[in-house]
Amino acid sequence: MKYAGMPFGLWMLFAGSFQKQLTAVLGYDAATARAITKKAKPQYRQIIRRLPEFEKADRFKMNIVNCAMVGAFILSMPQRPEVDSLTDYYARSMMTKPMQWFCRKSGKSKFTAKDIAAMKATAALKAADRNPYSWNMEFYEYPDGSGYEGRFTKCGICVLMKELGLYDLTPALCHLDYTMSEAGGVTNFVRQYTLASGGPYCDCGYKKKG
């Protein structure tokens, strides 16, 4: 994957937040936080370089790029974080003001015909059959009309985290689904299983609020 474009853009958008939360959540002093960030950047570029390019219709490129970023930061920390503290760190690092706005904007189009068509197209694409760093998903609408579920049988984040030697920390990344759903303001996020915790699949259920 080329660094120019989305990987470069997401570093510019989020690196400052990732650095700030090293102090706010993980307790590193400002100098150490700066040193971790400086070390993480080339690490991030290296991870991005060895990823394949994603197909144009694949909506999950941003997910793998964000995984590469948090992976690079973890590998640059003097001490490996616990899952709980990493969950908090990742959520706070990602939920910048622009990201909160993006979640609210996405929330407005949730459950529209366009949204459902896009979900069905994603399910039909089965991108992970050709790219192990992408996702395969099945799409189910709830029969009572209360929402829908994406059921993932292949997960690019699981593959990359395993390669980085960080697989046990993957649940911290899975939890962002709850945070983003909450920020969107229109759905209750429900989940029974994750692949990262040994489940048969990873279900992402979105139920209409109210």
Regions found by a protein language model. Name each.
Residues N131, S197-G198:
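A short catalytic or substrate-binding loop motif that flags glycine-/basic-rich loops and adjacent residues
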Residues A68, L176, G199:
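Short, well-structured alpha-helical interface segments that form or flank functional binding sites
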Residues L22, M77, K126-D129, D177-M180, ...:
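Hydrophobic, Leu/Ile/Phe/Ala-enriched alpha-helical segments that form helix-helix packing faces
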